[in-house]
Design a protein with these regions (language model features):
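Substrate-recognition element of Asp-dependent hydrolases with the DxDx(T/V) motif
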Residues: 27-56, 69, 89-93, 140-153, ...
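Short hydrophobic beta-strand segments
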Residues: 6-8, 86-94, 118-119, 145
């Protein structure tokens, strides 16, 4: 979260496919040299903040600290903790980034009637696993989307994004998702 005036940058504008985008190294270096606050936003749920820092280093974008990274999962958790003091039982699909934020916050991950069901990108799920999510939603779990992307580029190929999966789950279950992906007002509110 930004603690003073500064810049909010989406991770994908700095790095894609483990390569720095043109001008990314120079931009972050200029922020650091001028002591300008910045926050890098991402909806990536498959990786942890440490993984992101390592990827940035690999790309030649040096000196980024943990406090410079803010994920959509962090925003979702912060929102839920602020608005639902009784929230404790959650479940998720997605990667280790979601799991780490949930466990670091003290949520109990359970497959039995979670209050909130977080949905991040997981390209290895089966029909039966989506059926399990659907069942939990029909039993009363609140759907939480941490990645809005309708389409995402993987190895220069367009693939179905997490936002498309969330829309499928909304349609099937009749449960409207709480949405925390990049570009949402709530993500920007909690990031700034």
């Amino acid at each position: 979260m930004l603690t003073s005036k500064g810049y909010i940058i989406q991770l994908e504008t700095l790095m894609q496919q483990k390569q720095a985008m043109p001008g990314a190294k120079e931009l972050i270096q200029a922020f650091q040299m001028e002591n300008i606050s910045y926050l890098i936003l991402t909806e990536r749920s498959s990786v942890t903040v440490d993984d992101i820092l390592n990827q940035l280093e690999y790309c030649g974008i040096h000196g980024v600290k943990k406090e410079n990274i803010y994920t959509s999962t962090m925003a979702a958790v912060e929102y839920i903790v602020t608005h639902d003091k009784k929230a404790i039982d959650v479940d998720y699909i997605g990667g280790k980034g979601i799991r780490q934020v949930l466990t670091d916050t003290g949520f109990h991950i359970t497959h039995h009637q979670p209050q909130y069901f977080f949905v991040g990108m997981d390209r290895n799920l089966s029909y039966d696993e989506y059926q399990d999510v659907f069942t939990q939603l029909r039993k009363g779990s609140q759907l939480v989307s941490v990645d809005n992307r309708r389409i995402q580029i993987v190895d220069q190929v367009e693939k179905i994004g997490n936002g498309t999966i969330v829309r499928m789950l909304e349609y099937a279950s009749g449960v409207k998702a709480m949405n925390f992906g990049c570009g949402t007002k709530v993500l920007l509110k909690y990031a700034s």
